[in-house]
Curated annotation (Swiss-Prot):
GO molecular function, one term: zinc ion binding
Cofactors named for this entry: Zn(2+)
Binding-site positions, NADP(+): N52, L194, G196, L197, S216, T217, S218, K221, R261, V280, A282, S304, T306, R351
Known function: An alcohol dehydrogenase involved in the biosynthesis of seco-iridoid and derivatives monoterpenoid indole alkaloids natural products. Catalyzes the production of geissoschizine and its conversion to (16R)-E-isositsirikine and (16R)-Z-isositsirikine.
Record text on cofactor binding: Binds 2 Zn(2+) ions per subunit.
Gene designation: GS
Residue positions binding Zn(2+) 2: C104, C107, C110, C118
Protein name: Geissoschizine synthase
EC top class, as a word: oxidoreductase
Keywords, comma-separated and alphabetical: Alkaloid metabolism, Metal-binding, NADP, Oxidoreductase, Zinc
Domain of life: Eukaryota
Residue ranges of every copy of the Enoyl reductase (ER) domain listed in the record: 24-343
Length: 364
């Protein structure tokens, strides 16, 4: 039952990198993971992605970080051991783990493949295992032990180093676009922001067979948006004339910028009748909601957070089929503190991935 705590055999020695307090200083942290059970998969971690969420969790921005904190919700590696009742995986398989390592399994959301909206989730990077009383540590470590249900099969033709950030950036944009029917050919979709999320959103839109228009604050990103990511058009969000010309032309808009920075009325004005505005950037402050454009155009606003296990797997398979990867800088573990500072200063294009397999070793 949720809330119960029982003794767990913690025999798997592990080492990760994380924080001991909210100072932002990172250290090697030794800890133990549970002995693999009959349905568990033991994974040798090879790569772990790093994003803005990790940087903010390290510093306890939202007030619920539990220290010592080992981050990591974008993890890829290979199977080194399986439990006696594991059916999906064998030793040597390439696998991945996203933001979740458990859920209640009984609520409406879990029963309908939306485990990420379970009210009692076990997050990979820091929540407790409510049924077992075990502390959870993230994927920035040499090894993980995870229930096979929450382990994803990694496509053979998808590189793990530049693909591992898809476990955050990829699913965050893939899930709501598919849910809102924007994965159909011919759809015109606007993307606000061309960072880690926006650049991947453009790639998915083009693979769906859609038209992608990037709206950014910086004219400098125009060449990159069109030539590197395949966007069909680019608009600076201060160009009111161009934006007015696009009014009522888009089936959907995906706002990947930090919430509240882009006027809601501006984004809603771009939508066709029945169009959808998707928000994936969390606002730090309240913002005004203009209701009239919603009423007069039957437009919709939705928020979205990652995806269910089925969506995760679909996203990875789709990315492999269409050669969708993230713009990724691969680093060693010793560069992690510098990487976190660069994320804080918006000095990365667009994601970091740590080469865990070659740079993080457990030593007695």
């Amino acid at each position: 039952m949720a809330g119960e705590s029982t003794q767990v055999d913690l025999s798997v020695k592990a080492i990760g990198w994380g924080a001991k307090d909210a100072s932002g200083i990172l250290h090697p942290i030794k800890f133990s993971r549970r002995t693999p059970g009959e349905r568990d998969v033991k994974i040798r971690v090879l790569y772990c992605g790093v994003c803005n969420f990790d940087m903010e969790m390290v510093r306890n921005k939202w007030g619920f970080t539990r220290y010592p904190y080992v981050f990591g919700h974008e993890t890829a590696g290979e199977v080194v051991e399986v439990g006696s009742k594991v059916q999906k995986f064998k030793v040597g398989d390439k696998v991945a783990v996203g933001c979740m390592v458990g859920s209640c399994g009984k609520c409406y959301n879990c029963e309908n493949g939306m485990e990420n909206y379970c009210p009692e989730p076990n997050m990979a990077d820091g929540s407790v295992y409510r049924e077992q009383g075990e502390r959870s540590y993230g994927g920035c470590s040499n090894v993980m032990v995870v229930d096979e249900k929450f382990v994803l099969r990694w496509p053979e033709n998808l590189p793990q180093d530049t693909g591992v950030p898809l476990l955050c950036a990829g699913v965050v944009v893939y899930s709501p676009m598919k849910y809102m029917g924007l994965d159909k050919p011919g759809k015109h979709i606007g993307v606000f922001g061309l960072g880690g999320l926006g650049s991947v959103a453009v790639k998915f839109i083009k693979a769906f067979g859609g038209k992608a228009t990037v709206i950014s604050t910086s004219r400098r990103k125009e060449k990159e948006a069109i030539e590197e990511h395949g966007a069909d058009a680019f608009v600076v969000n201060s160009d009111t004339e161009q934006l007015q010309a696009l009014a009522g032309t888009m089936d959907g808009v995906v706002d990947t910028t930090p919430g509240g920075r882009t006027p809601m009325s501006l984004m809603l004005n771009l939508l066709k009748f029945d169009g959808s505005l998707i928000l994936v950037g969390a606002p730090e402050t309240l913002f005004e909601l203009p209701v009239q454009p919603l009423i007069l155009g039957r437009r919709k606003i939705i928020g979205s957070s990652t995806g269910g296990l089925k969506e995760y797997q679909e996203m990875l398979d789709f990315a492999a089929k269409h050669n969708i990867l993230c713009d990724t800088e691969v680093i060693g573990i010793d560069y992690l503190s510098t990487a976190m500072e660069r994320i804080k200063n918006l000095d990365v294009k667009y994601r970091f991935a740590i080469d865990i397999g070659n740079t993080l070793k457990y030593e007695e």
